[in-house]
Amino acid sequence: MPSPHGGVLQDLVARDASKKAELLEIAQSGDLTSWSLTARQICDLELILNGGFSPLDGFLNQQDYQSVVEKSRLQNGLVWTIPITLDVDAEFASQLSPDQRIVLLQDNEFPLAILTVSDVYQPDKAVEAKKVFRGDPEHPAVKYLFEQAGEFYVGGSLEAIQLPVHYDYPGWRKTPAQLRLEFESKQWDRVVAFQTRNPMHRAHRELTVRAARSNNSKILIHPVVGLTKPGDIDHHTRVRVYQEIIKRYPNGMAQLSLLPLAMRMGGDREAVWHAIIRKNYGASHFIVGRDHAGPGKNSKGVDFYGPYDAQELVESYKNELDIEVVPFRMVTYLPDEDRYAPIDEIDTDKTRTLNISGTELRNRLRDGGEIPAWFSYPEVVKILRESNPSRPKQGFALVLSETLPAQLKTALLSTFLQYGGGRHYKVLEHGNNEEILALVPDFVRSGTGLILQNASSLKGTNVFKIGEESGSDIPLETEDKNILHIVQRVVLFLEDQGFFQF
């Protein structure tokens, strides 16, 4: 088992356990300034406190931050590729000074740690965006930098009170110390870690087993359940899938543990960071995928990162990281032999292969199409269908232009109710109340068919606008105010979109 990055596991919770009561009393006294952490900051803090970000024992000061941005190294020379910073707004920053202690809160309530401020500095976000994430304005991390992150960063060391509170999957959230102890007790000295932010299917099971066999190792399935790419499948659905997949490995070969990481989708730099984290968790090998941690297409329609940038950068640090890189070998299904095989071992001109892309899978889930057993296990498909119902079971919101007759809402409701099918329908009277309008996505996700008027700013999945204005999803002629004509047009539109099946 490799040593933690930097030689020592910075388990701050264990280190500070003897003074937890004292720290908690100080934090709850009201004498210290407090900061309520964002979702990303909570993820970062948890991995500092539990040692997943070893050798870090706090948020980066300005010197370390600049060194990481410019050189992918801390000031002491250790490889570190992603800046871990505590961003705050200008008003809060103005209240801080060196050596001041501040309380870091979860949900503005639970004290997690006390930070002793080393410095407060204003980063050059343009340089960070370019050096760390290649600068494209469409990159999720660049968007976060300029649209969400505070203007100032606070550096400093941490004293741990407790890890963030999680109410889901407590048995699957292993800290680095816990995993290392389990690996040691089971004599797992060689462990290959598999990073994922997506559901797993048969191909993933096959490639991880092959990686383990070729390296004479065990398998750590280590999915991210913090923040991932916007639009990804929620972690609850994914964890239910992982719990089923883990049953499909030979007994004693694989272990599942959840990683509370806030991904930056930083491609090659992020892959190095992921390798360091897995090393801290006790893995000796790490599978680096094709376009690892890549966010897709940039503003010019080209992939943000090259397909092998991540593998090449991790490999270049191999001697310093003390973790073996296992290149992701894509496998494909051979229907004539009923087995999976690495695609680079197959002559595709002579051998028939089958595959289902991510886009095709989403289409089949949406349309209720078949997902064959060779692609995924029935239990996994069932979970995905529950969380991704087909169009006839999905909700929608129809937003009527304010110029349309109010009676149209009643006409649409009556028409929809006669079709049955189990979907609930509701006319939502909102009075431009933002709190009520904020509930629309929840209604839609629950499968409700909503009808509302005078909410032109409303946007989202399965939200359709009806009217004569340009940009309407269901355009109407200005002179057409015949309610029956409009109802028919709406019904045909919804049928075409798959919400109704006659």
Curated annotation (Swiss-Prot):
Active site location: T196, R197, N198
Pathway per the UniProt entry: Sulfur metabolism; hydrogen sulfide biosynthesis; sulfite from sulfate: step 1/3
- Chain positions covered by the region annotation Catalytic: 168-393
**UniProt region (Required for oligomerization), positions on chain:** 394-502
List of residues binding ATP = Q195, T196, R197, N198, G289, R290, D291, H292, V331
Q: Give the CC-aspect GO terms.
A: cytoplasm
According to the UniProt entry, its GO molecular function terms are:
ATP binding; sulfate adenylyltransferase (ATP) activity
Subunit record text: Homohexamer. Dimer of trimers.
PANTHER family given in the database record: SULFATE ADENYLYLTRANSFERASE (PTHR42700:SF1)
Name under which the protein is recorded: Sulfate adenylyltransferase
Task: Name its species.
Answer: Kluyveromyces lactis (strain ATCC 8585 / CBS 2359 / DSM 70799 / NBRC 1267 / NRRL Y-1140 / WM37)
